[in-house]
Structure formats: structure tokens, C-alpha cells
């Protein structure tokens, strides 16, 4: 006999399937509603151009990579990583592994090679416990790792887009990004649920 769903998980599922962006993604055969978040960011901030090299952290199920491919074209390149498996996308070099592990980081850097990256994007999030005192530090650790990736591979004048959950450490993190990039915006895309703490920091003009 299967486990009975909790009231909160049942509410989440009901909300999820009524979500207009979930429905739209399903109709258009897109990987996830995250596709629309990145599309909105691209419309306002113009991160992608044909021929770019992009690193996608926390890529599965592939919404961001799927969108980025449409912007960078056949001459572009995407190196994606996630702890979860992801169905192949043409033009995306996918590495499955835990980005927190040094061996996975090194494998990712090996795939990037000597070429500098034009955009680093991170949609990483931890498994949430429902306890902000636990969840926020876990989430901040992941976004710090994403920023470290910028320091290692991002080309001068490159861009960074990262999902961040507002809470302890957010202001300090934003301050660090502002010290590293010329222009920094905090975005809340329409496809992001109102009650979610998530926002997207969009940083352009990496100082290198």
C-alpha cells in the first residue's frame, strides 16, 4: 500500500498542475517551467548571443539548457552538470555528478578545457527540509560554489545568472557579486511562484 500524501504535498501538487507555466511547458513539450524564467531574463538582460560557451549548473531536467541552445545556436556550446540524470539535448555536453565533490568539479573543468566561458548559470537548489535555519545555509553554500566557478572559468565581461533564496547571507552574497561584476540586477520572473523566496541575480560585465 502506498504512502498517503501529506496535506502540504497535496496542496503543492494541486498548485503545480494548475500553474499556467507548467501547463504551457507541457503543451510546448519543454523540459520545465524554468525555460520561461530564463526566457524572461534574456528578454530584459540579453545574456546570450550565437556562438557562446555556457556552463549550466543544476541543469536537470534541462529547461535552462533547452532554452540556451535556442539562443547560442549550432556554433555555441553548453556544458551542463547535475546530481540527477538528464535526457540528452542536442548541443549540450552533460555530466552527471554532485557538483560539491572535487572529483566532479575537476571533471567539469576538464570538459570546459582551456576555453573561457561566456555565461555561467546556476539553478541549483538543495533538497529542502522545510526548516529555513537548515535550508538557507545549504542553498547559500551552493550559490557560493557557483560564484567560485565564475572565478575559475568566466571570461572578462562574461555574465552570471544564479537562483538565490532570500534569507541569511543573501546581502553579503549580493555584495560579493557586485564587487565582481559591472552591472547586477535582482529579478523575480513571472514564472517564479509569488510565495517562493527564490530570486535570480543577473550579473553582467565580469571584471576578471
Curated annotation (Swiss-Prot):
GO CC entries: cytoplasm
Cysteine disulfide partners in this protein: none
InterPro entries: RNA_methyltr_RlmE, RNA_MeTrfase_FtsJ_dom, rRNA-MeTfrase_E, rRNA_MeTrfase_gammaproteobac, SAM-dependent_MTases_sf
Main location: cytoplasm
One Pfam entry name: FtsJ
Catalytic activities: uridine(2552) in 23S rRNA + S-adenosyl-L-methionine = 2'-O-methyluridine(2552) in 23S rRNA + S-adenosyl-L-homocysteine + H(+)
GO MF term list: rRNA (uridine-2'-O-)-methyltransferase activity
Binding site for S-adenosyl-L-methionine: 62, 64, 82, 98, 123
Swiss-Prot/TrEMBL keywords: Cytoplasm, Methyltransferase, rRNA processing, S-adenosyl-L-methionine, Transferase
EC number, UniProt record: 2.1.1.166
Function: Specifically methylates the uridine in position 2552 of 23S rRNA at the 2'-O position of the ribose in the fully assembled 50S ribosomal subunit.
Protein's name in the database: Ribosomal RNA large subunit methyltransferase E
Organism in which the protein naturally occurs: Haemophilus ducreyi (strain 35000HP / ATCC 700724)
Taxonomic lineage: Bacteria, Pseudomonadati, Pseudomonadota, Gammaproteobacteria, Pasteurellales
